[in-house]
Each structure stands twice: as C-alpha cells, then as structure tokens.
Regions:
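Active-site-adjacent helix/loop segment of glycosyltransferases
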Residues: 203, 207-278
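Short beta-strand-to-loop acidic/aromatic patch adjacent to the donor-nucleotide binding site
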Residues: 79-90
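Conserved donor NDP-sugar-binding/catalytic core segment of glycosyltransferases
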Residues: 90-126
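Glycine-rich, basic loop-to-helix element that forms the pyrophosphate-binding segment
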Residues: 58-77
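A conserved acidic beta->alpha catalytic loop
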Residues: 34-44
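A short, conserved alpha-helix in the catalytic core of glycosyltransferases
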Residues: 160-162, 168-218
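Short, well-formed alpha-helical segments that are part of the catalytic scaffolds
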Residues: 11-25
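Short, flexible, basic/aromatic active-site loop/helix in glycosyltransferases
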Residues: 131-167
C-alpha cells in the first residue's frame, strides 16, 4: 500500500487544489493524510472531496512531527511506502507509480527523490552533501560570487542531474520512503520544528539503506524557500540549524565526513574538477 501526507498551515487554496489534483491523478496512492496545523479547521471540508483523504486538525507541532503523526497512522493501516509531500508541488500521474516500481526492484533503497524542477522546468539542485556550518554560512550570508564554488560542490552541481545518484541529503519537498526504513530510524526528529528535518532523516536512513536521486520522473516545485524572503522564517531556520549542529557536531562529525567522501568518490568529483567541468 502506498500512502502520502501533506502538512498545511494557512496554505493558499490554489496550492492545496494543485497538489490534491496530482495526488488524485496518481491512482496508486490509497490514502492521503492531510495534517492541518492552521489555527482554524477551514480545510476540514476537503475530506468530503475524496474517500482517500484522512483529515486531522492538529496543534502546530512542526513539519516533521506532523508527518510523523501521518506515518504512524499509515503504518497502522498497513502502508509499505509513504510519500511526504510539500503543498507547493505539481506532478504527473505516473510519478508515484514509477518510483514505486523502482523501489520494488531495489530493496536496498530506503528513500528516493525524483528530479525537482521549478515552474519554468529548470532543474533545482536539491541533491546535496551533508552540510557543515560553513556550507550554511556561504549559502545564506555571503554574496553569490563568494558562494559559487562552495555551492558547486555542496549541491553536486558538477554531477549529471539526468543520471541516478546515491546522495546523503535529499530535499524534503518530495520524499518517497520505504516504511520499513522510516520505522527503523523512528521517523523525523521532532526536535526540529522545520527545515533541517530532511537533512537529519536522510542521513539516518543513508546509514542503513541507499538514499537515491532518480531523475526518470520529475516534480514541479512551484515556490521558493520562504526563509529567503521572511526574516521571521530565517530566524526559525537558523534556530533549528543550531539544534541540528548541536546534535551532530559543529566541527567534528565523522559520519558527515565519511558520507561526503564516499559520495564525491562515487561521482568522480576529483577528476571532474581537474577537467574543469563547472
């Protein structure tokens, strides 16, 4: 059984309608858990639009905690695969089925992400190394001219985004999980209200399973990261990244070093760098 979940918080109507259409068109998704963290339960009405919807009006406990709630309910109902969705997505009807077929054929994969593109169809570079504090500083606070070389490596821009890759950090906007893998790592770490939960869960699954970028299908990610445009959300982002580095280590993180080294070696980064591919 394939299940899915989305978390809402005062989400615009057009976004919800767009992602719901994508889910409904994906005939293989048997249940969709809509976790609504909004102050009111206005979205309760959508439960009447389809028999697959399970609506929960929830206290705003955060992104990861809300998806954990959905995944616990999904596991109780026998789900074997679960898709964590952002509400700002649009995708074709074959995407989920194709990812399911891939996971069925590769039992060593615990988490897969399709190609992610923006509204214009341009690739978003969302396959990344496990971040260090300096990666965050370069990305957030320095001019693009300073951060270009760092991003080239950190976001694996030197790699071919038309080819499958094993990656230790996959974006949280579309996460296709093997339920067994999620249960093994006990889901998202609920200490993180939002933002680093995708880094954290990918690296924990990566320890036991392959975590794979699979570009044969793609998803439209329609809106930019809110923390780039909102001082309030930037503050939330930074607070949660501090919690992340307190958990895993600011300077000394041997697992980060190991995962990144293995990833760069598999992608032949040294030879590509020598060849001047940028």
């Amino acid at each position: 059984m394939i299940t899915a979940s989305i978390v809402l918080y005062n989400t615009p109507k057009f976004q919800v309608e767009t992602v719901l259409k994508s889910v409904f068109d994906s005939k293989c998704i048997e249940k969709l858990y809509v976790i609504d963290n909004s102050p009111n339960d206005w979205w309760r009405c959508i439960a009447k639009t389809s028999s697959i919807i399970r609506y929960v009006h929830n206290e705003n406990t955060g992104y990861g905690a809300s998806h954990n709630l959905a995944m616990r309910k999904a596991a109780e109902e026998g789900s074997t695969y679960h898709v964590v969705l952002n509400p700002d997505l649009k995708f074709d009807s074959n995407v989920v089925q194709t990812l399911y077929d891939f996971m069925e054929a590769h039992k060593d994969v615990g988490h897969v992400m399709p190609k992610i593109v923006n509204q214009e169809g341009e690739v978003q570079y969302l396959c990344k190394l496990v971040p260090s504090p300096s990666d965050l500083i370069f990305k957030r606070f320095l001019p693009k001219s300073f951060s270009k070389n760092s991003a080239y490596k950190f976001q694996l821009k030197f790699a071919d985004y038309d080819k499958e890759m094993d990656v230790p950090y996959l974006s949280g906007c579309f996460m296709f999980f093997r339920m067994e893998a999620v249960q093994k790592v006990k889901g998202f770490d609920e200490r993180f209200f939002m933002y680093p939960e995708d880094i954290d869960i990918t690296r924990r699954i990566h320890k036991f399973y392959r975590t794979v970028y699979y570009p044969k299908v793609f998803v439209y990610h329609l809106h930019a990261a809110e923390s780039y445009h909102s001082k309030k959300m930037l503050k939330v982002h930074m607070q949660n990244m501090i919690k992340y580095f307190n958990k895993w280590g600011w300077i000394f993180d041997s697992e980060r070093k190991q995962f990144n080294k293995e990833t760069l070696e598999k992608l032949d980064y040294k030879n590509l760098k020598k060849g001047g591919r940028k």
